[in-house]
Amino acid sequence: MVTTGSRTILVAHPGAEMFGSDRMLLESVIGMVETGARVVVALPARGLLDGALRAAGAEVVIVPMLVLRKVLLTPTGLPHLFRDLFRGLGAAWRLIGRVRPDAVYVSTIIIPQWPVIARLRRIRSVSHVHEAEASGNRLVNALLYLPHLASNSTLVNSRFSLDTIRGALPALARRSTVVYNGVGSPDDPEGPRAEIDGALRVLYVGRLSPRKGPDVIVDAAAALRRRGTDVTVTLLGAVFEGYEWYEEQLREQAASAEVDVVFAGFHTDVWPFLAEADVLVVPSRVDEPFGNTAVEGVLARRPVIASDSSGLREAAGGYSTAQLVPADDAEAVADALTVVRAEWPRIVSEVDAARAEGLRRHAPAIYRAAVAAAVLDTAL
């Protein structure tokens, strides 16, 4: 581990919730704090992440910043984009001048002002890319990645992300290094039940959005019900503001299909829900740069069914207790759930080996050390 008692790292992050990229930001900051560095985190708002960062030993400041969202690229959103851009540039310039960091760590590509201002301030910076949509417009991808050429180096969370960058902006890919996400878990998670008596308990963890595909699980459960198999579904997550219509649509879908669906809402602690589940399904319709949720399922000693696409292949691939299925295919998910039920004794016998492999691949300590070393080496 790199150790330092005299360096200051400024970290910029676009949100204050506790979803995937937020949790990885927290792990990154813990790694930096463990080196003895002073770590100052800039957020655009207060939230659950704010308190977790302070508990980890970081300082937190709230500053205006441009956070790229699709809504800003609409005719009504453009005035807000330019307002946030100029406010964000000024705030970043002033904060870097006040903190005087040795390095700036930019978490995600959707806060483009930070590497640019760091370069203008002659402060070295590291960008960490958690976003990748190979199926997206290549020009749009290139424009999103372009500001991060101002960083001195780039970390990416999967080979898929690296390949996506290479297809859009080869110059950035040549300066990028893959660091797989570190995923924490309980020391001794509850094992699966010895046999399935009654309904198969299916769990979904994540945002309730069409892109993430929880409706695919409801359709798969309906298909199993038609086949005579009893299934219960728990949806652990909430909608983005403005997507309340989608949750209502899910509720209507479940009621119409007569599927037993529990809307559990958002919880920061997913492990009790994994302990109650038999199988975790990750049915994303769109490209995922990685798939922390799939790894959490493996670490929880549960079988996993995930879309056979993008970074999910890296997250869920190579485990005997995980199945990859075509994206947006409810019948394929239903077939995979049938396999889980039919092969339950084998799965139960193999979940410990799968967990051991997941721990090897995604140990938080290794991730923290790798990110801290990249940032501090950049500052040398």
Segments and roles (model prediction):
Residues 247-265:
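Nucleotide-activated donor-binding/catalytic signature segment of Leloir-type glycosyltransferases, i.e.
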Residues 318-331, 338-344:
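Conserved acidic donor-binding segment of nucleotide-sugar-dependent glycosyltransferases
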